[in-house]
Amino acid sequence: MHLRLISCFFIILNFMEYIGSQNASRGRRQRRMHPNVSQGCQGGCATCSDYNGCLSCKPRLFFVLERIGMKQIGVCLSSCPSGYYGTRYPDINKCTKCKVDCDTCFNKNFCTKCKSGFYLHLGKCLDSCPEGLEANNHTMECVSIVHCEASEWSPWSPCMKKGKTCGFKRGTETRVRDILQHPSAKGNLCPPTSETRTCIVQRKKCSKGERGKKGRERKRKKLNKEERKETSSSSDSKGLESSIETPDQQENKERQQQQKRRARDKQQKSVSVSTVH
């Protein structure tokens, strides 16, 4: 019984030594393949170096080289950072830097957002937009030029003058239209949205309600004018009446004139008598 236990113990011990030797040989092979490889990799690294960081990544992670001064460090990320695009290969998932003028990209030849000062057009970053397109400084993209669009004209309005449809022969009529699409910076300007033309209609008398305030005002002015005219006529007639003398006034006037003549004659006689003496 004791012999069996001792033999089992030695068998287990030999098996553990065998596993340890296998792990050691695997580590020596990895060190030969990747010099300076650290066995304590972190941050998603499958293999790594104390000097260069990650050398390979765990499945589904992307490998990217980050420059720190003159040194490049390998990093494993779940997605590529801004300015890089990801490509999956059978043995590695890799992040590759976009072009110099591109901020974010889908692949090497298709940019989705340009850096400041460039305009995006069909996946490329341009200094200026091609002919037939214009730059949108808000989205920093080359967009189509938009021209103004207007609706059809409305029917002509009724012939009117000073807001009324009666009391005149010559007036004006108007028609309008709406702007359906406003133009972009380089688009054609919008046309006028209203037109007015002269119209001639058969004169018709305004009803009391149609005369309105202006009609009442004209009527009031007419009445005031007639009243002033009547006042002027009455004052003229009074002046004329005052210039005509009544028979009594004429008789008194003649009597006064006779008295004046008698007094004059009497004075002349007295002067002649004094001269004779």
Curated annotation (Swiss-Prot):
Residue ranges with Low complexity bias: 232-245
Q: What does this protein do?
A: Activator of the canonical Wnt signaling pathway by acting as a ligand for LGR4-6 receptors, which acts as a key regulator of angiogenesis. Upon binding to LGR4-6 (LGR4, LGR5 or LGR6), LGR4-6 associate with phosphorylated LRP6 and frizzled receptors that are activated by extracellular Wnt receptors, triggering the canonical Wnt signaling pathway to increase expression of target genes. Also regulates the canonical Wnt/beta-catenin-dependent pathway and non-canonical Wnt signaling by acting as an inhibitor of ZNRF3, an important regulator of the Wnt signaling pathway.
Cysteine disulfide links = C41-C48, C45-C54, C57-C76, C80-C95, C98-C105, C102-C111, C114-C125, C129-C142, C148-C190, C159-C166, C199-C206
Which chain positions lie within coiled-coil regions? none
The residues forming the signal peptide are 1-21
Name the residues that span the membrane. none
Cellular component GO terms, alphabetical: extracellular region
Tell me the InterPro entries matching this sequence: Furin_repeat (IPR006212), Growth_fac_rcpt_cys_sf (IPR009030), R-spondin (IPR051514), Rspo_Fu-CRD_dom (IPR043601), TSP1_rpt (IPR000884), TSP1_rpt_sf (IPR036383), TSP1_spondin_dom (IPR044004)
Recorded GO molecular functions are: frizzled binding; heparin binding; signaling receptor binding
Record comment regarding domains: The FU repeats are required for activation and stabilization of beta-catenin.
Expression tissues: Highly expressed in endothelial cells.
Task: Map out region (Disordered) in residue numbers.
Answer: 210-277
Name of the gene this protein is made from: Rspo3
Q: Which SUPFAM superfamilies does this UniProt record tie to the protein? A: Growth factor receptor domain, TSP-1 type 1 repeat
Upon gene disruption, the observed phenotype is: Embryonic lethality due to vascular remodeling defects. Conditional knockout in endothelial cells results in impaired developmental and tumor vascular remodeling. Mice show endothelial cell apoptosis and vascular pruning, leading to reduced microvessel density.
Output the Gene3D superfamilies linked to this UniProt entry.
Hormone Receptor, Insulin-like Growth Factor Receptor 1, Chain A, domain 2, Thrombospondin type-1 (TSP1) repeat
Task: Mention any Pfam family matching this sequence.
Answer: Furin-like_2
Q: What is this protein called?
A: R-spondin-3
Which residues fall in a compositionally biased region of kind Basic residues?
A: 213-223
Subcellular location(s) per record: Secreted
